[in-house]
UniProtKB/Swiss-Prot annotation:
GO terms for biological process: translation. One of its GO terms (molecular function) is structural constituent of ribosome. This is Large ribosomal subunit protein bL33. Coiled coil: none annotated. Signal peptide: none annotated. Belongs to the bacterial ribosomal protein bL33 family. The gene is rpmG.
Length: 55
């Protein structure tokens, strides 16, 4: 059985609020860590979210 192409990752806020999103990414095409700007409702503004592993 083959290994799945997409894996689940956690996008954690850089504003140190503890807020995070869970999303999928294709590990074969996106080898580097994902950094994306999204809305943090605790900080009430758009901040960068960095990829971390789901524990």
């Amino acid at each position: 059985m083959a290994k799945p192409a997409s894996i689940k990752i956690k996008l954690e806020s850089t504003a140190d609020t503890g807020y995070f999103y869970v999303t999928k990414k294709n590990s074969r095409t996106m080898t580097e860590k994902m950094v994306i700007k999204k809305y943090d409702p605790i900080a009430r503004k758009h901040v960068e979210f960095k990829e971390t592993k789901i524990k």
